[in-house]
Amino acid sequence: MARTMRSRVVAGAVACAMSIAPFAGTTAVMTLATTHAAMAATAPAAGYAATRYPIILVHGLSGTDKYAGVLEYWYGIQEDLQQNGATVYVANLSGFQSDDGPNGRGEQLLAYVKTVLAATGATKVNLVGHSQGGLSSRYVAAVAPDLVASVTTIGTPHRGSEFADFVQDVLAYDPTGLSSSVIAAFVNVFGILTSSSHNTNQDALAALQTLTTARAATYNQNYPSAGLGAPGSCQTGAPTETVGGNTHLLYSWAGTAIQPTLSVFGVTGATDTSTLPLVDPANVLDLSTLALFGTGTVMINRGSGQNDGLVSKCSALYGKVLSTSYKWNHLDEINQLLGVRGAYAEDPVAVIRTHANRLKLAGV
């Protein structure tokens, strides 16, 4: 049983890695062309997303600004925001690294924020982080509060990820202890090769530990935020925080496509609410759809409840929660893979565009 489960996890991890790689079939490209044409035909008025301060999009685990300098992490999102009047920058941090510490993603993001401010003449930025990018954004808001106007987190594991716990437990079964270092070495190379800048600052084991529920609790103690609810409550916190006299607007949303179903002999089933059963094209065109359904099922059986395949609803709650009802998996949240998503999934590009307008109306 344990061996079978581990095999499934390995298969799911391989599928996830493959899904992130820069490739697309002809059918997927045709679908994307149609989608972009429809978006252009219904585009809001110019200036709709013109926020007062620049927006910085912050990628999560395994990310970069453009994979191998070609495939955007935030697929089609930066362009859409720019077309609607926003000033948008995309951070390029270590794909595999912790958020704190001198080599951490937080310090990397802080340096990038200062670069953007120097280039634009702005005094603050709006940080929008996906997955681990939300934790990196919180770091900057904590250590340099005067540089931040708002923090928005999308599918961020503020309480850690049950799947990260699971992977850590599986690696602990190895009596030699070699598997962790060997796998980490391969993952680090993957991070270097896929980074647009071939960033060598990669530490897969540190990244894994950062995303566990235990380490997340420590991170929250070291970098507290009013946007967090009480530990274990599955509640969000305040919609704003004031740090050193600087007020930050705090927002979050998340996908919860993976929902628990019936339990049989102690094993809980799951369903992907984003797709048509069996026949949805996303199951074929986007390998991450089935992979994240598998990882989400593992999470449910570790008590996570509804999730996006990597982050639970409860873990994603932060600040003013705009929605936890999107029928998205973890990659749908950033319009991946290549804009392909399940038949019932909402348009993430439109959601982020609307949020930029929300920030504009809030005066930031």
From Swiss-Prot:
Record comment: activity regulation: Inhibited by RC-(Rp,Sp)- and SC-(Rp,Sp)-1,2-dioctylcarbamoylglycero-3-O-p-nitrophenyl octylphosphonate. Also inhibited by diethyl-p-nitrophenylphosphate (E600).
Record organism: Burkholderia cepacia (Pseudomonas cepacia)
EC number: 3.1.1.3
Keyword Signal attached: yes
Gene: lip
AB hydrolase-1 domain residues: 54-266
Secretion signal span: 1-44
GO terms under biological process: lipid catabolic process
Any one GO molecular function term: metal ion binding
Protein name as annotated: Triacylglycerol lipase
Reaction(s) the record says it catalyses: a triacylglycerol + H2O = a diacylglycerol + a fatty acid + H(+)
